[in-house]
A protein has these predicted regions:
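Feature captures hydrophobic
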Residues: 1-183
């Protein structure tokens, strides 16, 4: 488990280090994807708003006011952010780039609420707004373990739904589009 400092350190140092490491082993075409931007709103005491922009082999932390229309806005509580940051998981922006999903992210329009059940029964939550649009919206519910398996390709999203590992409420078309992030 990583020892994480404040969110500012995570977004200005940890995520850029993850990006550099991800590119080191990646095919050249990973860095040739279009520019991708993300804003992170960490709510509650200790939180703040942070912005990242990736262009080619460069990742840049920006003052949040300089990123008016990010491709992806992620909203989560300070406690849920800290839990994620301490898990040694790769930041989702870096993961989407590494897996060549920039075009998929940029094509999404709507809001995805994610509710993951941890092994201790507590719920980890985040909201991702794609393309600056609140609607359509979908809520996904599953275990943290199953979500990780789905993102890694070990668990097919359709199979997760058919076996009851993935439950959703809201827009089926948006759910189908979001499924492309896990393929």
């Amino acid at each position: 488990m990583a020892d994480i400092s404040p969110p500012e350190v995570y977004f200005t140092q940890t995520v850029p280090e993850q990006y550099t490491a991800a590119l080191a082993d990646a095919p050249a075409n990973v860095a040739e994807q279009p520019e991708l931007s993300a804003a992170y709103e960490i709510t509650g005491p200790g939180g703040g708003t942070y912005a990242l922009r990736v262009a080619g082999a460069q990742i840049e932390a920006l003052p949040s006011e300089q990123l008016a229309n990010p491709d992806m806005r992620v909203i989560l509580s300070y406690d849920d952010w800290r839990s994620f940051a301490e898990s040694d998981a790769t930041d989702m922006l870096v993961d989407y780039i590494r897996r060549r999903k920039v075009g998929v992210v940029q094509g999404l329009k709507g809001t995805v609420h994610l509710e993951l059940t941890r092994s201790d029964g507590s719920i980890w939550q985040s909201t991702m707004i794609f393309g600056g649009q609140a609607e359509p919206a979908v809520t996904l519910r599953m275990t943290n373990e199953d979500y990780g398996a789905m993102l890694s390709g070990e668990l097919n999203g359709q199979m997760a739904f058919m076996t009851g590992k993935l439950k959703f409420e809201g827009s089926l078309p948006l759910l189908m589009q979001v499924g492309a992030l896990s393929s």
